[in-house]
C-alpha cells in the first residue's frame, strides 16, 4: 500500500463522479489515502462539498469563489468551463455573503479555491477585487488560502506580497526564483499531475529548489491525471505517481515524500 497520501486539492463534488462518488471515496483509505481537502468554488457546490466532508472523517473542506465563477454563461462555450455561479449572476459580493455562514463549520479549514485566471474572459478588475477580498477574509478568519493562478503570476504575487497570507499556491506553475521568495513568506506549493507531464521543466526546477517541508501533493481531480495515466479521470490514489516523480527529482525515497507532504498538509490546514 502506498502512502500516507494527503490530497490537498480535490473536486469530488464534480459531476464526473456522479456515477460512483461514494464507492470511490470508500475505497481510498485502503489505497493509502489519509486525507483529502475538498474544494468548493461557489455557493452552489458548497453544500455538496460539506456533505462529503461530514460523511468522511478524513475529508476536510475549503470554501471560496473560483475566478471562473465570475464568467457569464455566454462566455463559456462548448470547450470552456461550466458557468459555476448563476445564483448571483457573477455578483461576487453577494456570493461572499452567501458563503459567510459556512466558515463557522469546523470541517472548513481554508478559504478557496480562489485567485486569478487570465485565460478566460473574466473582467480583471472584478477578479482582483474578489481575490483581495478573499485574502482579507482568510486573514480575518486565521485560515489558509488556496490560491489559483493561471497566466496571472505578477498580479497574484503582488497581492500575496502585500498581504502575506498563509496557504497553498495550488498547481504551482511559476519559476523557481519566485517560489523561493514566496516560500520565505511561509507559503506552501501544491504539485499534482501536471508536474509529471513531458516538458514540465519549470515545475521540475521549482520542486528541486524548494525544501520538501513546503511541498504538498494534490490531484485537482477529476482533472490532471498524471503520467502514465494522463487523460483519464483522476482520483487521489493516483498521487502515487506524483510522489514517485518528486522523489526522483529530489533524490529521496517515495516514503519520505509521502510522509513529509502529509505532515505539511496537516500543518497548513491546522489539523
What are these regions (language model features)?
Residues 1-271:
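Mid-domain alpha/beta scaffold segments of enzyme catalytic cores
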Amino acid at each position: 500500500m502506498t502512502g500516507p497520501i494527503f490530497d490537498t486539492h480535490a473536486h469530488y463534488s464534480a459531476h464526473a463522479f456522479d456515477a460512483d462518488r461514494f464507492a470511490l471515496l470508500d475505497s481510498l483509505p485502503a489505497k493509502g489515502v489519509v486525507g483529502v481537502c475538498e474544494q468548493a468554488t461557489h455557493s452552489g457546490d458548497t453544500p455538496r462539498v460539506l456533505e462529503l466532508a461530514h460523511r468522511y472523517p478524513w475529508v476536510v473542506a475549503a470554501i471560496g469563489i473560483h475566478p471562473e465563477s465570475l464568467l457569464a454563461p455566454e462566455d463559456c462555450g462548448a470547450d470552456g468551463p461550466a458557468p459555476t455561479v448563476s445564483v448571483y449572476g457573477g455578483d461576487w459580493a453577494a456570493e461572499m455573503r452567501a458563503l459567510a455562514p459556512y466558515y463557522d463549520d469546523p470541517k472548513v479549514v481554508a478559504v478557496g479555491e480562489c485567485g486569478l485566471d487570465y485565460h478566460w474572459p473574466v473582467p480583471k478588475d472584478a477578479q482582483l477585487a474578489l481575490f483581495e477580498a478573499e485574502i482579507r477574509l482568510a486573514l480575518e478568519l486565521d485560515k489558509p488560502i488556496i490560491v489559483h493562478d493561471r497566466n496571472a503570476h505578477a498580479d497574484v504575487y503582488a497581492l500575496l506580497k502585500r498581504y502575506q497570507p498563509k496557504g497553498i499556491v495550488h498547481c504551482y506553475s511559476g519559476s523557481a526564483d519566485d517560489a523561493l521568495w514566496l516560500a520565505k513568506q511561509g507559503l506552501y506549493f501544491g504539485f499534482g499531475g501536471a508536474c509529471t507531464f513531458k516538458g514540465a521543466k519549470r515545475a521540475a526546477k521549482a520542486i528541486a529548489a524548494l525544501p520538501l517541508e513546503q511541498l504538498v501533493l494534490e490531484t485537482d481531480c477529476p482533472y490532471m491525471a498524471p503520467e502514465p495515466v494522463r487523460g483519464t479521470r483522476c482520483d487521489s490514489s493516483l498521487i502515487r505517481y506524483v510522489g514517485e516523480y518528486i522523489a526522483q527529482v529530489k533524490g529521496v525515497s517515495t516514503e519520505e515524500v509521502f510522509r513529509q507532504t502529509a505532515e505539511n498538509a496537516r500543518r497548513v490546514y491546522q489539523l
